[in-house]
A protein has these predicted regions:
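Non-membrane alpha-helical structural segments and their capping/turn regions in soluble enzymes
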Residues: 24-27, 31, 121-124, 273
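Short, flexible turn/loop "capping" segments at secondary-structure junctions
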Residues: 9, 106, 167-170
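N-terminal Rossmann-like or analogous alpha/beta NTP/dinucleotide-binding catalytic cores
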Residues: 1-104, 259, 263
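Short helix-capping/linker segments at secondary-structure and domain boundaries
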Residues: 5-6, 71-75, 108-115, 221-230, ...
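Short, histidine-centered active-site or binding-site loop motifs used for metal coordination
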Residues: 13-15, 112-113, 171
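Short connector loops/turns at beta-strand edges and beta->alpha or beta->beta junctions
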Residues: 14, 103-107, 163, 222
Length: 302
């Protein structure tokens, strides 16, 4: 993608503030995610890779877009409803306006295509709403309508280990396999994955938790391995313990080369600093161009 498009990738440390992270943990997480991006192949020479909080223009656009975002539409966000249910004691304004900040992340660079998972498509639709609303109110065409760039049928939502939802840092430590997890950590997490007592009817539909395990296996295991356990499930002889042991070893083999690269990259402070500085400069140029147009349209001095 980075060789075919003018790509922007960022580390979303503003977004993480809704969970009130410890400052030292936040700093370490930013460094780790940057190393992970680089280890997975992002090239700071080919794309713009930056830290969200290094771009105050995003915060300004977030503020300006909030002036035309309505409480009712924000409360209808599926993600907001989920968070209210999951953490009723921490329903803060940042959670409510999360889609507006996501819109600012996208619109600050006037992005045309956004790599987005299916669970975030509602937020992309809200981004189009906010951008179009701004254009209409101020009689301008500053913001394009961004569309999903999701590789079509090749798109796979990586499921979590808890039996439902997606795999992600925000969903809980035990729900996700991190690229830098040690082999013993991966084994423990996978062996704790949710299962049931097993099928009793041949070729029965798989419950969500079981389908999740098969989806994970389809990502990291050989086709023959997947087929073996598919057949075992369909003829009701499957042993989930054996399946999870195999899945854990295949995950370890899949993540090990990346984990080694992450470790080496984290040790190279000069490389990390250079990547952040390069990305910050390129992101500032793009964001400043957008904000000039936005401020002029609103009537602010530029």
């Amino acid at each position: 993608m980075q060789y075919e498009y003018h790509c922007f990738f960022f580390i979303a440390d503003y977004h993480s503030l809704t969970t009130h992270p410890n400052p030292e943990n936040l700093k370490g997480n930013v460094r780790t995610v940057l190393a992970e991006y680089l280890a997975c192949g992002l090239d700071p020479e080919k794309c713009t890779l930056y830290v969200q909080s290094d771009l105050p223009q995003t915060a300004e656009l977030y503020l300006l877009l909030n002036m035309h975002a309505y409480v009712g539409e924000l409360e209808r966000s599926t993600t907001f409803k989920d968070k209210v249910r999951q953490q009723p004691d921490n329903v803060n304004a940042g959670l409510l306006t999360y889609p507006v900040l996501m819109a600012a992340d996208i619109l600050i660079h006037r992005a045309a295509k956004v790599p987005v998972g299916k669970d975030q498509e509602q937020h992309l639709e809200m981004t189009r709403t906010f951008g179009n609303r701004f254009n209409r109110i101020y009689k301008t065409d500053i913001f394009p309508e961004p569309v999903a760039f999701n590789f079509g049928k090749q798109l796979v939502k990586v499921p979590g280990l808890d039996g439902s939802g997606k795999m992600g840092k925000s969903e809980g430590e035990g729900n996700a396999i991190f690229l830098s997890d040690a082999p013993e950590v991966i084994r423990k997490k996978v062996m704790r994955a949710v299962t049931d007592s097993g099928p009793t009817i041949p070729n029965a539909p798989k419950p969500e938790a079981i389908q999740n395990l098969f989806t994970l296996m389809s990502i990291v295991s050989k086709p023959d391995t997947v087929n073996y356990f598919e057949e075992s499930y369909n003829n009701c002889t499957i042993r989930y313990g054996d399946m999870k042991k195999q899945l854990a070893e295949d995950m370890i083999a899949f993540t090990a080369p990346i984990a080694e690269k992450i470790k080496a990259t984290l040790a190279d402070t000069a490389l990390l600093q250079k990547a952040m500085a390069m990305g910050k400069e390129k992101a500032h140029y793009s964001a400043n161009e957008t904000l000039k147009l936005v401020r002029s349209a609103i009537g602010f001095s530029v």
